[in-house]
């Protein structure tokens, strides 16, 4: 999935993590913990003070009875939604929390059954009340199907399962349900955030080897279309970009937003593509992969190299996300203290560096790009370009140090805002039309010899 390229990162990465800032100057970027150690409501209520000692800004949690299945028709009594317990949780440091919801049901999604969807919508309205009562930001939505009975997979299309209706005919039902889904969730939480761990990246990957209608996520694009149609002006759909689990360089993080939106829009009808391209992007860190917590993840890296990989990925994830980084783990448990030594400090140090850079009050920021590869102990002397950014005029000046550079791209968080080919050795960009001085500025240069040069400006 990821090409082997030589990568260059801005020297600003090397700013000391000792630049700690008071709480009021924290970055708007947030890191959310999610994993097999997800807490239930009762655990949260009893342990929130200790939990908030972990280096996160929020957590993905579940009800006591189980992970909530989005298409569940079970008519549960109100007490199972734990409104009272949720209202009594004393959140302080954890400001951005999400209820774990799976895109599944033990009896299927009932796409064609209006009566079942009356029950599903009633339940989702209760979930919406849960979000309002708990002051959670929204749901962490996992559309992957994990169960052995494939006939209950809501996203697979087989004509024989749907009264021999065509793919498009079933899709119209699924689209209707996606609209009902988000509208029900907006009932009590109009500003809900739906963090989709996968949006359309998974079907994008599956469709490379087979027709879309035959993939394991065949019906999911219709559901996403429905969400887009039912979305109000306050709610937000977030692409969790699970692809970022395995990135080994910053290019994947930088290009992900543009790539996900452009390629994902191919699965969305034309009239909804502009709205789809407004979807925000999150970035993921898969701790178990980086630290090789299972044999299949082993790459032969020593402890120091794994630590550099984690640090570099966290840094790039923070710089390129629109708001959220989700830290996923399976074989550690933050809430029982079963975490590798030094990991919490790495997260804290990266957050402090991000905060210091985000709150840099200097009017002018200058830097050179240099080689920084987590597999190496120290940066190379290579310099791709020099840049100077002036805040009050919102002007970016670039001088190429590598004459083989053939393209320059400028990003604001996950969004590509400028794309220049065959740039001059010295040039300036007036950013006023496309950059409102919020979020991070990133410069990506590519050369004719295959090198990619990166600078994180702020």
Language-model region placement:
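Edge beta-strands of extracellular beta-sandwich domains
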Residues: 451-458
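Short strand-edge motifs at loop-to-beta-strand transitions and within beta-strands
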Residues: 425-429
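Short, compositionally biased P/S/T/A/G/V-rich stretches that sit at domain boundaries
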Residues: 362-391
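Short beta-strand segments within Ig-like beta-sandwich modules, predominantly Fibronectin type-III
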Residues: 418-424
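Bacterial Sec-dependent N-terminal signal peptides
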Residues: 1-24
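Glycan-processing catalytic domains of CAZymes
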Residues: 24-367
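Surface-exposed, short loops/turns at beta-strand junctions within beta-sandwich domains
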Residues: 431-438
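Conserved structural position at the C-terminal beta-strand
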Residues: 445-447
């Amino acid at each position: 999935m990821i090409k082997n390229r030589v990568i260059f990162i801005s020297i600003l990465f090397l700013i000391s993590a000792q630049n700690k800032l008071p709480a009021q100057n924290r970055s708007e970027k947030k890191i959310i913990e999610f994993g097999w150690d997800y807490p239930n409501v009762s655990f949260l209520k009893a342990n929130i003070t200790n939990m908030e000692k972990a280096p996160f800004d929020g957590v993905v949690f579940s009800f006591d009875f189980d992970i909530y299945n989005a298409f569940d028709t079970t008519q549960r009594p109100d007490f199972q939604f734990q409104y009272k317990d949720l209202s009594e949780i004393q959140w302080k440091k954890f400001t951005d929390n999400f209820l774990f919801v799976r895109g599944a049901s033990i009896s299927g999604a009932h796409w064609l059954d209006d009566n079942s969807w009356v029950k599903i919508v009633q339940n989702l309205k209760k979930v919406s009340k849960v979000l309002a009562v708990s002051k959670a930001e929204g749901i962490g939505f996992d559309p992957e199907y994990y169960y052995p009975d494939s006939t209950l997979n809501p996203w697979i299309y087989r004509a024989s399962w749907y009264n021999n209706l065509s793919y498009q005919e079933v899709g119209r039902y699924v689209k209707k349900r996606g609209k009902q889904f988000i509208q029900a969730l907006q009932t009590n939480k109009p500003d809900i955030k739906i963090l989709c761990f996968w949006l359309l990246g998974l079907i994008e990957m599956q469709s490379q080897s087979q027709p879309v209608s035959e993939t394991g996520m065949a019906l999911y694009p219709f559901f996403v279309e429905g969400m887009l149609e039912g979305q109000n002006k306050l709610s937000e759909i977030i692409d969790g970009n699970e692809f970022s689990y395995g990135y080994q360089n910053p290019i994947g993080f930088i290009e992900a937003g543009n790539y996900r939106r452009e390629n994902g829009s191919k699965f969305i009808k034309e009239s909804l593509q502009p709205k789809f391209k407004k979807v925000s992007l999150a970035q993921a860190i898969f701790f178990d992969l980086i630290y090789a917590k299972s044999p299949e993840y082993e790459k032969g890296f020593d402890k120091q190299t794994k630590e550099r990989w984690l640090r570099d990925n966290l840094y790039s994830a923070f710089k390129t996300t629109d708001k959220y980084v989700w830290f996923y783990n399976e074989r550690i448990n933050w809430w029982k203290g079963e975490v590798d030594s030094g990991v919490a400090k790495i997260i804290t140090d990266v957050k402090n560096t991000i905060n210091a850079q985000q709150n840099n009050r200097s009017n002018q920021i200058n830097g050179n790009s240099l080689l920084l590869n987590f597999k190496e102990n120290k940066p190379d002397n290579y310099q791709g370009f020099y840049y100077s950014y002036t805040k009050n005029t919102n002007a970016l000046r670039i001088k190429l140090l590598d004459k083989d550079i053939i393209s320059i791209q400028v990003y604001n968080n996950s969004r590509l805002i400028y794309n220049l080919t065959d740039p001059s050795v010295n040039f300036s960009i007036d950013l006023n039309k496309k950059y409102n001085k919020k979020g991070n500025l990133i410069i990506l240069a590519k050369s004719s010899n295959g090198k990619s040069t990166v600078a994180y400006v702020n």
